[in-house]
């Protein structure tokens, strides 16, 4: 439920009535007088520090005065001028791409990548990868296997088989039965 707000004026103050407007103006002036007297009352405790105005660079002022489209062009020109004498962030000249070989400066020839074997020098030829059989280099030629050298040490000739266990040829197929006592395990 809505109740009318009581005011000091016994007549209803509606919009556009001059008596209400004048009363509001009087109240506003009275409030201002109270504020100024209160401010004088506490003025000894409040200290105002003078603000120091700082002047901006004239370069920024020119950017503010130019039109929106023109300022974009000026920014692009500044970027181009900035890169003329300087190289890129990873040591390659401006205008070149990372794929041109300027990605890092680790001593590799241009156009090569880390995967081509220039990350460290593990003893394999340049341009080969770890998967090409050059993972370790203990003095053997690349591609040789340790097992081949072990087989050579066993002393098998060309006429003998490299498999040292006796092969059982199917004697049971010919009708002769074998017992487990006849099969001898090899001497180790």
Swiss-Prot record:
Source organism superkingdom: Eukaryota
Record-listed Phosphoserine modification sites: 37, 121, 180
Region (Disordered), start-end ranges: 79-142
Sorted UniProt keywords: Isopeptide bond, Phosphoprotein, Ubl conjugation
Biased composition (Basic residues): 80-92
Compositionally biased region (Polar residues): 94-107
Protein name: UPF0461 protein C5orf24 homolog
Organism: Bos taurus
């Amino acid at each position: 439920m809505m109740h009318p707000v009581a005011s000091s004026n016994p007549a209803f103050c509606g919009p556009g009535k001059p008596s209400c407007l004048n009363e509001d103006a009087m109240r506003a002036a009275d409030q201002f007088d109270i504020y100024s007297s209160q401010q004088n009352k506490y003025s000894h405790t409040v200290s105002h520090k003078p603000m120091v105005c700082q002047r901006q660079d004239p370069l920024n002022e020119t950017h503010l005065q130019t039109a929106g489209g023109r300022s974009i062009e000026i920014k692009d020109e500044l970027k181009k001028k900035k890169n003329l004498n300087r190289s890129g962030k990873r040591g390659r000249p401006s205008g070149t791409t990372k794929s041109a070989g300027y990605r890092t400066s680790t001593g590799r020839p241009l156009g090569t990548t880390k995967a081509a074997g220039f990350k460290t020098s593990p003893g394999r030829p340049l341009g080969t990868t770890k998967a090409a059989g050059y993972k370790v280099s203990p003095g053997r030629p690349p591609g040789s296997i340790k097992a081949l050298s072990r087989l050579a040490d066993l002393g098998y000739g060309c006429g003998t088989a490299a498999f040292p266990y006796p092969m059982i040829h199917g004697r049971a197929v010919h009708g002769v039965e074998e017992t487990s006592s006849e099969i001898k395990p090899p001497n180790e």
